[in-house]
Amino acid sequence: GLDAVAAGGVAVAGVVSAGRRAVLFTGQGSQRVGMGRELYDRFGVFAESFDRVCGLIDGELPGSLRDVVWSGGSPGALDRTVFAQAGLFAVEVALWELLRSWGVRADFFAGHSVGEVTAAYAAGMLSLEDACTLVAARGRLMQALPAGGVMAAVAASEADVCLVIEVTGAAVDVAAVNGPAAVVVSGAADEVEMVVATCRGRGWRTRSLAVSHAFHSRLMEPMLDGFRAVVAGLDWRVPAVPVVSNVSGAMADPLELVDPEYWVRHVRQPVRFADGV
């Protein structure tokens, strides 16, 4: 296993013909300065795809995406949601195009939060141009919201966390359900602290997330109308490959996915990742 990998040997051998392949694209929080740089330098397909996204999206961003992803730009620039979402999308598209060039095909696509936009592109629902427009608008409109929102991970079930929210009366939303005991809450800082303090009092582990805004919460609502106008103007096509929905946590109805209102709900409602997996 790992010893073989460390020695440069073959860790796994053989051919598997059964089973189907799912491809998952990650969401915000996984970005890091320099991500994809070695792949860019080594593989022309990756470089061409990354450059194409940057060329399409730079005009809609407050700076060069390549500069921010490669060098970080100003301190913390890549962690600003306007750049984080665009940077992840650019790297994920380039990764997928590289895999495709090697003959990899997917039977299902899924994505965590903004990663589902990459899934939509990979499934043939949007042209690259329209996908770039969506990602840029999503990040730009979220970035323009007032600061002060926070998110926290809680090691408890969704039902238990919802009960705490109800008991405290806090204006907090469940933003993601990532596992049986892995829930993220989102809202204004003082409201989330009420929930977190109660959770800690019950012996549950909690962790503050490094985010600029309270994503997938009621604090996103002021940007929804502007986002709705953007997604309504895109050319949507039914997916050529099935997509698992963040909103429902189930295989998405192809006609639902091409309804612009789905992508508005996608911003506001929790990521049902555990159900989707």
Residue locations for each model-derived region?
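Short, surface-exposed "cap/lid" segments of acyl-processing enzymes
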Residues: S17-E48, R52
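Helix-enriched interaction subdomains in cytosolic or periplasmic regions
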Residues: G1-A6
